[in-house]
């Protein structure tokens, strides 16, 4: 999976880049059909924000997290995306198991 990292008012150091890659590549354990991700790291006066847009088959997923520490924001972002990816995977697998109401109706 390709991960693009952009920084607003923050320099993306190699350590920060490696941390983002390590945390967000774990999402592939939950779902194999991840095509790409765009991560934006932003620093304002008192908060560090991490946002990510994840391209999956049949849609896109978005999550953001705010914290006083950038690494904590990345951790929270990873947790939010993991929940969204598992929910998306369950939607796709459960959708194919549905049967029509018409076939189950009693004549």
Regions found by a protein language model. Give the residues of each.
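N-terminal, polar/charged subdomain of small-to-medium soluble alpha/beta proteins
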Residues: 1-107
């Amino acid at each position: 999976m390709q991960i693009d990292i952009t920084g607003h008012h923050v320099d993306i150091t190699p350590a920060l880049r490696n941390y983002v890659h390590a945390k967000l590549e774990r999402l592939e354990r939950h779902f194999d059909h991840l095509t790409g991700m765009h991560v934006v790291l932003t620093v304002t006066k008192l908060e560090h924000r991490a946002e990510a847009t994840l391209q999956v088959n049949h849609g896109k997923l978005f999550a953001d997290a705010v914290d006083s520490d950038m690494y904590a924001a990345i951790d929270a972002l990873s947790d939010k995306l993991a929940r969204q990816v598992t929910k998306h995977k369950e939607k796709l697998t459960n959708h194919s198991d549905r049967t029509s109401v018409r076939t189950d109706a009693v004549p």
